Design a protein with these regions (language model features):
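Alpha-helical transmembrane spans of integral membrane proteins, capturing the lipid-embedded, hydrophobic core
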Residues: 28, 32-36, 40, 59-64, ...
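Transmembrane helix-loop-helix hairpins at the membrane interface
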Residues: 135-335
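Membrane-embedded alpha-helical segments in integral membrane proteins
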Residues: 35-49, 168, 327-331
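Juxtamembrane helix-loop-helix connectors linking adjacent transmembrane helices
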Residues: 7-8, 46-50, 78-148, 159, ...
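Structural signal for membrane-spanning alpha-helices in multi-pass inner-membrane proteins
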Residues: 39, 43, 66-73, 179-183, ...
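Interfacial transmembrane-helix boundary/kink motif in multi-pass membrane proteins
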Residues: 5-37, 77-106, 133, 261-265, ...
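Interfacial loop-to-helix junctions that mark the boundaries of transmembrane helices
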Residues: 49-57, 125-130, 257-266
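Membrane-helix interface linkers and caps
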Residues: 2-15, 51-99, 110-117, 276-302
């Protein structure tokens, strides 16, 4: 083939596609602020007047807020919304990791319940959900947030954060802050920070939205089941990662009576110490399913083994036990 043969031909096969752009942190923050603005206007009104239908509209808007900017900014959706075939080891590891994160969320809510009983009770009165059926809640409260909110947070926002922050712990902390502010109410910030950081950490380990979505769905499902089984599970029902949809209404006196300093110390010991093991085991199983080289449960190198065990197991357990016993002693000694 020479020049004369292609001189007047149409260069269809030679046209270069416009290169994909990376989503910047500034753009991600702008999108996030737009979502918050929509929550205080369209989404909140939809929830007030339409109940669970409003929640469905809210989640649909969240998904649109995640997807539309990717199209406008000409970002690669395959890099922003990473979904791959799941691995059985990593799937089990994600669920084990969730148990640890959920336990820490219970501790965070218990702390807020002890420190701010009045505000804690008011937030649950203001967000009490309308009556619904379990199949509807399964879709609206459990499934839709697991897809829509993960697309926004672990998809759009974390794809921007990881371009500037390469350390996974740093990414998780930043994403925890985003997830906390997403849920609007300050009294819920600590628990939502923990859950957001945990979801982002697992997503950073796997590069697969399936696992964080599975964790999100499982967390909402567990809290929803507790809501149907009984109204007394204060700390567990409090960790529903959803802007609205809370089923529990309690008085400040009931909250205060339920969470004394001694009770908090006991919860810290009961939930905190096992959480350390669940988080470590969950991460190991995730790495076993996703890493190219199968990891050891404990490093074989003596120096590294000592460092890992001390930093990941011994130190957290000692700190949790010390603080838990301190609150127990305060509660017993002073009756608070």
């Amino acid at each position: 083939m020479n020049y004369e043969q292609i001189r007047f031909s149409r260069p269809d096969g030679l046209v270069r596609k416009k290169p994909f752009q990376k989503v910047t942190i500034r753009q991600a923050v702008t999108v996030f602020l737009i979502q918050i603005l929509l929550f205080f206007t369209v989404e909140s009104l939809a929830q007030i007047y339409l109940g669970n239908g409003g929640l469905a509209i809210t989640e649909a808007i969240v998904l649109a807020v995640a997807v539309i900017p990717v199209w406008i900014l000409h970002a690669d959706p395959r890099e922003v919304f990473l979904v791959r075939r799941p691995n059985r080891w990593a799937t089990g590891g994600a669920l084990v990791f969730l148990i640890g994160a959920y336990s820490l969320s219970v501790i965070a809510n218990s702390l807020m319940m002890m420190l701010f009983p009045k505000e804690f009770a008011q937030i649950y009165e203001s967000t009490e959900a309308a009556s619904s059926t379990f199949p509807v809640d399964l879709v609206v409260v459990c499934l839709m947030p697991a897809v829509c909110e993960e697309a926004l947070h672990r998809g759009l926002i974390q794809s921007a954060v990881r371009e500037r922050v390469h350390h996974l712990v740093g990414q998780s902390i930043i994403m925890g802050v985003f997830f906390a502010f997403f849920h609007v109410y300050p009294i819920r910030y600590p628990a939502m920070f923990v859950m957001g950081a945990a979801l982002s950490y697992v997503y950073g380990l796997t590069g697969n939205l399936f696992y964080s979505s599975l964790m999100h769905f499982s967390c909402n499902l567990f809290a929803t089941l507790l809501g149907y089984l009984g109204q007394g599970a204060l700390t567990a029902a409090a960790v529903v990662p959803l802007p609205g949809g809370i089923r529990l209404t309690v008085s400040p006196e009931e909250v205060s009576a339920a969470m004394s300093a001694g009770s908090f110390g006991l919860i810290l010991l009961i939930y905190g110490i096992p959480a350390v093991f669940f988080l470590y085991l969950g991460e190991y199983l995730i790495r076993r399913g996703t890493d190219a080289v199968r990891p050891y449960f404990v490093p074989r190198d003596r120096r590294r083994q000592k460092s890992v065990l001390w930093n990941r197991i011994y130190s957290p357990i000692i700190a949790i036990a010390a603080v838990g016993v301190l609150f127990l002693v305060i509660g017993i000694a002073f009756g608070i």
